[in-house]
């Protein structure tokens, strides 16, 4: 496939990630190409500048359209402005002020996150369906969320509205998640819920709330909230007997954990990892890993080595920054060891593995050309771990070409991903549609 950045695969993938939202209004083709032309390979500052310019232009166009009563252009402009703003801050790198302390986020990160939400909320009143802004109780916080509802003419006849709860992943925010499930679900008669959980979006940038591996605890509270919300708003006709969960990449791992909740009746897990430690150490010599974990090599040596390699690779520096920020850690060796907590493997407490808790139907996908996760060590192990899901209720989707979804998290193929997602959910919930 054509490369937008020929000698920078990380930048190329992230540019496709932005370009892929074009089908749902998150970008315009020429604007993306214009930005790409201004970015130098592996240069985060030109990346930030190029997308900031496009964001400012899109915001100005949206304001002009709003003033002239052009609803569609205003909606498109605010969506693009929000998405380009998100992209502009994507390559920010957190720093460690001293050894052992948590990383300090780039000072620009919080204002960017707030601007992304502000612009997106300007788009919400212009959407065809109703969107409710939520505050989901979690510890002493309120997780921000959106509930996207189908317009009346897109309701599924003769039944309440089925619900899809989408979990973000390692580096997304709920405004970006719009281009996955919410952009398509209401048109199919589904209500879709997104939220920023611990370690994600504004909850990370503003409050420093760290991620947790037992994501079922988070989605459990989201579902608790939905039960209360549906009871308080019976006119919405939300179907609490038809709740599904979804997510991509790390969000796919989260979706599988969420599916252990018996209130969840279907799960769509897009390109998840099976074990984060395996992912984090996949390209490191097993001999080196054994020497370190056996005590022959110190954590300090690993940290110094990673610091040296980070000077040579912006991608590695960025990856350490992202994981360290949402884990609340600064030491690369501690970050890697912390990844062991994010696993679906069997343990002494759960000999069959966490996935043995899942009994609902599951659509599981892998990415044949993933930049990060190979199919055999992650996708197929997830599939095999679903021992209590009948074979007829497990679907495996592993595309091998980019246009069919072979890039990680189905970047560049969101429309196809949604088509497969909602067809699967229709089957799970007994929804029959007439041919057109």
Curated annotation (Swiss-Prot):
Pfam families: Abhydrolase_6 (PF12697). One of its GO terms (molecular function) is hydrolase activity. InterPro entries: AB_hydrolase_1 (IPR000073), AB_hydrolase_fold (IPR029058), FrsA_esterase (IPR050261). It comes from the Eukaryota. Its EC number is 3.7.1.-. Keywords: Hydrolase. The active site is at residue 249. Pathway: Mycotoxin biosynthesis. Belongs to the AB hydrolase superfamily. FUS2 hydrolase family. Hydrolyase; part of the gene cluster that mediates the biosynthesis of a family of the mycotoxins cytochalasins E and K. The hybrid PKS-NRPS synthetase ccsA and the enoyl reductase ccsC are responsible for fusion of phenylalanine with an octaketide backbone and subsequent release of the stable tetramic acid precursor. The polyketide synthase module (PKS) of the PKS-NRPS ccsA is responsible for the synthesis of the octaketide backbone. The downstream nonribosomal peptide synthetase (NRPS) amidates the carboxyl end of the octaketide with a phenylalanine. Homodimer. This is Hydrolyase ccsE.
């Amino acid at each position: 496939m054509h490369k937008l950045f020929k000698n920078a695969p990380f930048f190329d993938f992230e540019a496709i990630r932005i370009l892929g939202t074009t089908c749902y209004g998150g970008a315009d083709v020429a604007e993306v190409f214009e930005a790409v032309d201004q970015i130098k390979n592996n240069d985060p500052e030109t990346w930030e500048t190029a997308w900031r310019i496009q964001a400012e232009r899109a915001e100005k166009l949206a304001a002009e359209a709003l003033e002239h009563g052009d609803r569609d252009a205003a909606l498109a402009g605010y969506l693009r402005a929000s998405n380009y703003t998100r992209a502009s801050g994507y390559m920010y790198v957190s720093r460690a002020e001293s050894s052992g302390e948590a990383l300090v986020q780039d000072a620009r990160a919080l204002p960017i996150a707030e601007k992304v939400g502000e612009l997106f909320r300007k788009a919400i009143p212009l959407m065809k369906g109703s969107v409710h802004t939520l505050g989901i109780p979690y510890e002493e916080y309120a997780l921000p969320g959106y509930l996207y509802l189908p317009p009346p003419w897109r309701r599924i006849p003769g039944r309440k509205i089925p619900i899809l709860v989408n979990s973000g992943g390692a580096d997304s925010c709920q405004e970006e998640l719009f281009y996955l499930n919410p952009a398509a679900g209401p048109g199919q008669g589904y209500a879709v819920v997104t939220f920023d959980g611990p370690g994600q979006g504004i909850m990370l940038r503003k409050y420093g709330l760290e991620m947790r591996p037992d994501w079922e605890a988070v989605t459990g509270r989201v579902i608790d909230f939905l039960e209360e919300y549906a009871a308080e708003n019976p006119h919405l006709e939300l179907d609490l007997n038809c709740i599904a969960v979804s997510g991509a990449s790390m969000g796919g791992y989260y979706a599988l954990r969420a599916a252990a909740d018996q209130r969840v009746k279907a799960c769509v897990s897009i390109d998840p990892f099976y074990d984060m430690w395996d992912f984090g150490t996949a390209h490191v010599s097993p001999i080196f890993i054994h020497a370190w974990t056996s005590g022959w090599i110190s954590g300090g040596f690993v940290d110094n080595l990673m610091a040296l390699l980070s000077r040579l690779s912006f991608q590695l520096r960025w990856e350490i920054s992202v994981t360290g920020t949402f884990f609340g850690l600064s030491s690369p060796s501690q970050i890697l060891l912390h990844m062991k907590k994010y696993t679906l493997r069997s343990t002494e407490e759960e000999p069959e593995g966490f996935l043995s808790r899942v009994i609902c139907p599951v659509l599981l996908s892998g990415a044949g050309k993933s930049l990060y996760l190979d199919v055999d060590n992650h996708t197929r192990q997830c599939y095999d771990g679903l021992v209590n899901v009948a074979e007829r209720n497990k679907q495996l989707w592993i595309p091998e070409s980019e246009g069919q979804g072979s890039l990680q998290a189905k970047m560049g193929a969101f429309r196809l991903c949604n088509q497969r997602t909602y067809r699967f959910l229709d089957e799970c919930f007994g929804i029959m549609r007439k041919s057109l």
